[in-house]
From Swiss-Prot:
InterPro entries: Ribosomal_uL13, Ribosomal_uL13_bac-type, Ribosomal_uL13_sf. Signal peptide: none annotated. The gene is rplM. Keywords: Ribonucleoprotein, Ribosomal protein. It comes from the Bacteria. One of its GO terms (biological process) is negative regulation of translation. Belongs to the universal ribosomal protein uL13 family. This is Large ribosomal subunit protein uL13. This protein is one of the early assembly proteins of the 50S ribosomal subunit, although it is not seen to bind rRNA by itself. It is important during the early stages of 50S assembly. Part of the 50S ribosomal subunit. The keyword Disulfide bond does not apply. It holds the Pfam family Ribosomal_L13.
Length: 142
């Protein structure tokens, strides 16, 4: 018996929708990263993008446990001396709902061309509506 290796043109991708209302950020992010990578499939191959498309709705209603809403910090830098900016999870959810989830998932995926292709299959929406009903996504419960 030979070892199976998936080919990029033979991969079939499903569409899934996740309702993130009152779900914990890290638990949703780890499941999304797992499925974007394709590790839930028997034909998973590390060097081929075998993952599915994931739609996350109600990302503005994600929560974190403990005091992380005020204590968890996100940093960015302008590139200039002294140009570091920080924001908390709570403020980021107010200004850009869903960005915290995108950053969490992106950190869990491989770095490089394969990881960049995987993150493009993630669609995050702050509200309950999404424009992907034509793909007939299946509900995924976490």
């Amino acid at each position: 018996m030979k070892t199976f290796s998936a080919k990029a043109h033979e991969v079939t991708r499903e569409w899934y929708v996740i309702d993130a209302t009152d779900k914990v950020l890290g638990r949703v992010a780890s499941e999304v990263a797992h499925r974007l990578r394709g590790k839930h499939k028997p034909e998973f191959t590390p060097h081929v993008d075998t993952g599915d498309f994931i739609i996350v709705i109600n990302a503005g209603k994600l929560r974190v446990t403990g005091n992380k809403a005020t204590d968890k910090k996100y940093y960015r830098h302008s590139g200039y001396p002294g140009g570091i900016y920080e924001t908390t999870f709570g403020k980021m959810q107010e200004r850009f709902p869903g960005r915290a989830l995108e950053k969490a998932v992106k950190g869990m995926l491989p770095k490089g061309p394969l990881g960049y292709a995987m993150i493009k299959k993630l669609k995050v929406y702050a509200e309950a509506t999404h424009p992907h009903s034509a793909q007939q996504p299946k509900a995924l419960e976490i």
